[in-house]
Amino acid sequence: MKTPIELKILDSRIGSEFPLPAYATLGSAGMDLRAMIDTTMTIAPGETQLIPTGIAIHVADPGLAAVLLPRSGLGHKHGIVLGNLVGLIDSDYQGPLMVSCWNRSDIPFTLEIGDRLAQLVFVPVVQAQFKLVDEFDSSDRGEGGFGHSGTK
């Protein structure tokens, strides 16, 4: 069963020239988001640009959130990743989805109209309530931090 999420089309090219976000395969975890820009755009090395996706969503269910993740091929082949590394969309957000695109390579990257540039994934959310304590119950790890458990 799929959870219904409200989607608003902000760019009329979505649904006509370019498809609505959808799962590519039965096993896909994310839906591709597209660059709904007006003209071809070049992102210079080291530059970050905010790219519209042409849609807005309203998750509504506080037990869910959406995350924006980079597409692996863009990062590996072209050095294009998300400027904020991961985008978190809270269940009560209703504004346009924008993708912060960072060119971490040393060559310019050309983004064409409608290019797929990020993935939208829905994840469960647990809202925690803190319980104040003076001490923690002991654990095997304790305060061991970065690199504490080794590499092998």
UniProtKB/Swiss-Prot annotation:
Binding, substrate: R71, S72, G73, N84, L88, I89, D90, M98
Please, which domain of life does this record's source organism belong to?
Answer: Bacteria
Q: What is its EC number?
A: 3.6.1.23
Q: Which reaction does it catalyse?
A: dUTP + H2O = dUMP + diphosphate + H(+)
Enzyme class, first EC level, given as a word: hydrolase
Give yes or no: UniProt keyword Transmembrane: no
Q: In which pathway does it act?
A: Pyrimidine metabolism; dUMP biosynthesis; dUMP from dCTP (dUTP route): step 2/2
Question: What PANTHER family does its record include?
Answer: DEOXYURIDINE 5'-TRIPHOSPHATE NUCLEOTIDOHYDROLASE
**Protein task:** This enzyme is involved in nucleotide metabolism: it produces dUMP, the immediate precursor of thymidine nucleotides and it decreases the intracellular concentration of dUTP so that uracil cannot be incorporated into DNA.
Return the similarity comment.
Belongs to the dUTPase family.
Which HAMAP family does the record match to this protein?
A: dUTPase_bact (MF_00116)
Query: How is this protein named in the record?
Result: Deoxyuridine 5'-triphosphate nucleotidohydrolase
- Native source organism of the sequence: Shewanella sp. (strain MR-7)
